[in-house]
Regions:
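A residue-level signal for conserved active-site and pocket-lining positions in enzyme catalytic cores
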Residues: 5, 28, 65, 80, ...
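N-terminal anchoring/stem segment of glycosyltransferases
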Residues: 1-58, 67-71, 199-203, 214-217, ...
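Hydrophobic/aromatic beta-strand patches that form the interior of the parallel beta-sheet core
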Residues: 6, 29-31, 44, 75-77, ...
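Short acidic (Asp/Glu) patches
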Residues: 55-63, 89, 154-161
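GT-A fold catalytic core of metal-dependent nucleotide-sugar glycosyltransferases
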Residues: 62-116, 122
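Residues that flank catalytic or metal-binding motifs in active/ligand-binding sites
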Residues: 1, 24, 61, 77, ...
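Cell wall/extracellular polymer interaction/catalysis modules
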Residues: 42, 46, 77, 101, ...
């Protein structure tokens, strides 16, 4: 069984995080448009398709079946996450389903269980930051303090409501995605998820649970808080863009 841990770093916002534990039988691959060097990761330099670094990374994040046709199982980790335990211990979570991730409702600092609530939190934070720091807002970017365009998010949530997508229907925390991506149902759901991100909000946590619901796609939640658990550690906020000498 071929297995791969992978990440994607675009626009120079992260250095690749070296694992503190290397599980047996896994390849490690990092996609990037940046001059990164690692003795641990296989660095694959690729060209970005979008001006938005976040959306470029999300494309690799959501579609492992396109990048790893010879691997059966993949484990995505965000660029600011670290592998620190034997992730072979997690394979039972994708024994009877094709997808496992962490439950946002198990996050100690900010438990949530609803995409509509997540949307409200994102927009409220942007409103608050814009009000508190108006002098930082560029003339040509009124949504500078928002994680994404609030009008786009609201439009997307209204569409979900019009399709009768239920509230309190779960919310993933997408720092880690464990998938049996060679399976057709998983591939179709990931393609639909990517369509939501490509044409809607780049905030992927807003659209996964909807995409799973739409496809009747079953998945498991991994145990624990995504930011600090036996197998993974969140290393803090993404670094500011830096220029290599």
């Amino acid at each position: 069984m071929n297995k791969v841990v992978y990440t994607a770093i675009f626009g120079g916002y992260d250095d690749v995080v070296e694992p503190t534990y290397r599980p047996d039988g896994w390849d490690f691959v990092c996609f990037t448009d940046t001059d990164l060097v690692s003795e641990f990761w296989e660095i694959r330099n690729v060209l970005p398709l979008y001006e938005d670094s976040t959306r470029n990374a999300r494309r690799y994040k959501v579609l492992p079946h396109r990048w790893f046709p010879n691997h059966e199982i993949s484990c995505w980790i965000d660029g600011n996450a670290q592998v620190r335990g034997d992730i072979n211990e997690l394979l039972d979570y994708v024994q009877n389903v094709d997808f496992a991730t962490f439950d946002h409702n198990q996050c100690y600092l900010d438990p949530r269980n609803c995409v509509y609530e997540e949307a409200n939190v994102i927009i409220s934070a942007g409103n608050r930051n814009t009000q508190n720091r108006p002098n930082e807002v560029p003339f040509d970017n009124p949504y500078y303090h928002y994680q994404d365009n609030p009008n786009l998010i609201l439009k997307q949530m209204k569409r979900y409501q019009s399709e009768n997508y239920p509230s309190q229907n779960g919310l993933l925390s997408s720092m880690v995605l464990l998938r049996r991506h060679s399976e057709e149902k998983c591939q179709q759901t990931m393609e639909d998820w990517w369509t939501e991100i490509k044409y809607g909000s780049k905030r992927d946590q807003l659209s996964f649970n909807y995409s799973a619901w739409k496809n009747n796609f079953e998945f498991n939640y991994l145990e624990g808080d995504v930011r600090n658990n036996k197998h993974f550690l969140h290393m803090g906020r993404h670094k500011k863009k830096r220029v290599r000498q």
